[in-house]
Amino acid sequence: MRHPSREIMSELIHDQWTKDSIFAAVIDPDGNIVAKGHTTVGPDNDPTAHAEINAIRNACRKLGVSRFPDGYWLYTTFEPCPMCASAIIWAGIDGVVYANNPDYRGKEDNWSFISCEKVIEAGSYLHKSEMVKDFMIDEIKAYFI
């Protein structure tokens, strides 16, 4: 599959607009959504329950793995924070596509005090992940501002 996919990101952006939460999804090598996750920090009383972490957890459970085989990607409607970017590396995800960035966060806290790109670069000795930044940003940034 070629990344990025407008179809996949459009679905996640639609989910965010209609369900009022940041969304992420793990994508298999054939371009299928394996599992989605959305931010549940408040409802779960869990500061690690970001959309990306929840999507990775759900996909790992579904596939019965703790590290993805080659070809899996993560799509998310917001730039992954340092924790989520680290999880992308540890999970063996080959690429990440995100829509919005902290410049358009509105009232949201800026958890990206270290950019996703810097974390992915620093962890490249463990696992190399590609990155597509600001994909379809014009379709999502109005949600935050």
Residue ranges and their predicted role:
Residues 81:
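Conserved G/P- and acidic residue-centered "switch" motifs that form tight phosphate/ATP-binding loops
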Residues 22-31:
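Short beta-strand scaffold segments in enzyme catalytic cores
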Residues 1-18, 86-145:
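Zinc-dependent deaminase
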Residues 40-54, 58:
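A short, polar/charged loop-to-alpha-helix boundary motif
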Residues 62, 84-87:
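Cys/His-rich metal-chelating microdomains
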Residues 65-78:
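Immediate flanking context of iron-sulfur cluster ligation sites
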Residues 32-41:
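Short beta->alpha transition motifs characteristic of CBS
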